[in-house]
Amino acid sequence: MARAKFLREKLHVNVGTIGHVDHGKTTLTAALTKIGAERFGGEFKAYDAIDAAPEEKARGITISTAHVEYESAVRHYAHVDCPGHADYVKNMITGAAQMDGAILVCSAADGPMPQTREHILLSRQVGVPHIVVFLNKADMVDDAELLELVEMEVRELLSKYDFPGDDTPIIHGSARLALEGDQSDIGVPAILKLVEALDTFIPDPTRDVDRPFLMPVEDVFSISGRGTVVTGRIERGIIKVGDEIEIVGIRDTQKTTVTGVEMFRKLLDQGQAGDNAGLLLRGTKRDDVERGQVLCKPGSIKPHTEFEAEVYVLSKDEGGRHTPFFKGYRPQFYFRTTDITGACQLPEGVEMVMPGDNVKMVVTLINPVAMDEGLRFAIREGGRTVGAGVVAKIIK
């Protein structure tokens, strides 16, 4: 094994299984780890080990998620699988497990079911960029025409939610047979075909460091003789001394120049995604900047007040509300580092939202916030989290 350490690390990609209950998501997850371990490295995780997913907390919400890993010839995959439908909803909305792509598992015997549709819709809303399909339980369908029909239905469903249905790779197979080591077309070879589809159809993810610079403002200090220092954790990109930046959100956008980058009281030439840094800003006064704004590459992000969101409302057991809320509900929306009050408009025909529901809503904030589609937020009442959401579409 000594020579393994000379190999350059494989590119890391995050994926997960989605689809209707009992269509075989967990069996497929087990098969991927088994065949990955046999061919490319990693370790086999049995069905029972994956199914007993531990509970974890993301933004105060308890979610059961199984995390497994497997490799292909060129990539290292981190894969999430959830035991229950509610866990998927929470996982996707909170972004607890960000996916670069998803594997939609659909039973060839049953065809698309309500959760198949809901998971595709959620993927669209929360910004899962790519989906590949595994048509499972193909051993239970003798009729080739029936298989084709199910495949057509799945493609139509994907197209309906703006995924490229016609171009999506759809692999027919049986996760159970593959786990048993079956070498027919729908056994082990189908899993290898699926991994190949992941390798080719899901593009290499852009690393945070390669995206335009953005840092949420956590604190602002004025240092006599030096000017104003803004601290925060750099969310993406790289910032160098001398770079021009914008201060966006809450008030009118301002431009300034970074004259110093500090980490742990040391001066640096640059800071990058993941760093906790202090940025010295030229000519900016202490009162010009406040928590809740962001520093960013000029023109890369705009302030907005109105957007469509996909929201999960915490149940009473999760510490959420005990009662439903109605249209005109005005909680605080916690974006990055600050709470901003906003009004909720519910979809037509929805009178109220119960704790434990997920719902699409239009939110109007009282102050503008720097946002992109895909930005996560918490919904709070007096500092207590009562929901989680994601910006699905910016309106203005």
Swiss-Prot record:
It comes from Xanthomonas campestris pv. campestris (strain ATCC 33913 / DSM 3586 / NCPPB 528 / LMG 568 / P 25). This is Elongation factor Tu-A. Residues 10-206 form the tr-type G domain. One of its GO terms (cellular component) is cytoplasm. Keywords: Cytoplasm, Elongation factor, GTP-binding, Hydrolase, Magnesium, Metal-binding, Nucleotide-binding, Protein biosynthesis. SUPFAM superfamilies: EF-Tu/eEF-1alpha/eIF2-gamma C-terminal domain (SSF50465), P-loop containing nucleoside triphosphate hydrolases (SSF52540), Translation proteins (SSF50447). It is found in: Cytoplasm. The gene is tufA. Monomer. GTP hydrolase that promotes the GTP-dependent binding of aminoacyl-tRNA to the A-site of ribosomes during protein biosynthesis. Pfam families: GTP_EFTU (PF00009), GTP_EFTU_D2 (PF03144), GTP_EFTU_D3 (PF03143). Belongs to the TRAFAC class translation factor GTPase superfamily. Classic translation factor GTPase family. EF-Tu/EF-1A subfamily. Gene3D superfamilies: P-loop containing nucleotide triphosphate hydrolases, Translation factors. Residues 60-64 are annotated as: G2. Its EC number is 3.6.5.3. GO terms for biological process: translational elongation. GO terms for molecular function: GTP binding; GTPase activity; guanosine tetraphosphate binding; translation elongation factor activity. Its main location: cytoplasm. PANTHER family: ELONGATION FACTOR TU, MITOCHONDRIAL (PTHR43721:SF22), ELONGATION FACTOR TU-RELATED (PTHR43721). Mg(2+) binds at residue 26. GTP binds at residues 19-26, 81-85, 136-139. Residues 136-139 are annotated as: G4. Residues 19-26 are annotated as: G1. Residues 174-176 are annotated as: G5. It catalyses: GTP + H2O = GDP + phosphate + H(+). Residues 81-84 are annotated as: G3.
